[in-house]
A protein has these predicted regions:
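Flexible, glycine/charged-enriched surface loops at secondary-structure junctions
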Residues: 94-100
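Alpha/beta enzyme core
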Residues: 1-73, 77-85, 89, 93
Length: 100
């Protein structure tokens, strides 16, 4: 969904949520720390974002005002990729050793 002024719209919505008594703000689609910082400074609500390859530094996100980082499906994907690699090794080596 395209929004004409995404940052301004997000800040306006954050204020509405805050005024309505929300306990937190979950913002998706942000891709840089500067934008996150602007959003965090615009509200007293704890800010939650989804970590991505571009937003992978917990320290940077925290310094930008993020209070909670969601991993979405990324943790599961990483786990399944690791399992797949181990199973390929088991099949190739015909040994259970890669499990240990």
């Amino acid at each position: 969904m395209k929004v004409e002024s995404p940052l301004e719209t997000t800040i306006k919505r954050a204020k509405l949520y805050q005024d309505a008594g929300a306990d937190g703000l979950f913002v998706t689609g942000v891709s840089d720390n500067a934008t996150i910082k602007e959003i965090a400074l615009s509200t007293t609500l704890p800010l939650n974002v989804v970590g991505t390859a571009k937003l992978s530094s917990i320290k940077s996100l925290s310094e930008s005002g993020v209070k909670r980082i969601s991993m979405a499906v990324f943790l599961y994907r990483a786990t399944y990729n690791q399992i797949e690699n181990i199973l390929k090794e088991v099949i190739t080596e015909q040994s259970l050793e890669p499990l240990f």
